[in-house]
Amino acid sequence: MYQALYRKYRPQTFSDVVGQKSVTDTLRAQLETGKLSHAYLFTGTRGTGKTSCAKILAKAVNCENPNHGAPCGLCPSCRAIDEGSCMDVLEIDAASNNGVDSVRVLRDDAIYTPGTVKMRVYIIDEVHMLSTAAFNALLKIIEEPPAHLLFILATTELQKVPATILSRCQRFAFKRLRPDEIASRLNFIAYQEHIEIEPEAINLLARLADGGMRDGVSLLCAQAMETIEKQYMLSLIHISEPTRRVVI
C-alpha cells in the first residue's frame, strides 16, 4: 500500500526536525531536567514542524528509555504513540472540533489518570479555530491542570488566540525554513526512494515550498507519482525501469 512521502518521512525524534534547533534544544533540555511546562503553544506557518514536534514531545514525556531528552522510539509507549493506538495521547483538530461541547468532553476526560503511559497528552492543532466559549472551557483546565496532564497547542494564526490562553502557555515560534534546508531533506528522501532528480529540480521544489517542509515533500511526491504510475504500467507488461527520473 502506497504511503505519502510526507507521512513516511515525518520526523520521529528531535534530531530529525529540520531548521528548528533552538526549539528542539530547549525542549530536550527541559525533558532532561524535568522542568516541563503543563501547556505549550507552538506557533508558525504551516509545514514547519509544529505537529511533528508535538508528537515527539508526547513520546518523550512517556518514553520508558529516553536518551538525553529524546524518545527511544522502540519502547511500547513510543510505538503505541507512533501507531496512533495510545488512548492517552490524543490529537484534536480544532477546525472540525471547535465547539464548547468538544472541549467540555476533553475537560471531563482529563481528570482521569492515564492508563498505559505516564502522562496524558492533548495535542490541539489549529487551536485558533476554537470558539470563544470553547476557549473559555479550555482555560479552566489549563489554569489548574492535573499533574498527569500536558497540553500542546499549535496554531498558524497566533493573533487569534486569546491573551488568557497565551499567558498560561510556554510559547515556541517555529521559523520558516530556508530553501537550502528544504532541498537537503528532499535530496535525502529522493535518494532513499530511488528517485533520480536533477539538482535544479530539487532547488525549484524547495523554493516553491515557500518555507514549509511538508509542502516541499508533497511537491516531490506529486512529481514522482507521474513516473511511479508509468513504471507500474510497464511492469504489467513485464518491462522494468531501474529508477524514477524527475526533471522539471
Predicted regions and their residues:
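P-loop/Walker A NTP-binding region and its immediately flanking N-terminal helices
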Residues: 1-171, 181
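Extended, largely alpha-helical regulatory/partner-binding modules appended to the mid-to-C-terminal parts
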Residues: 23, 76, 80-87, 105, ...
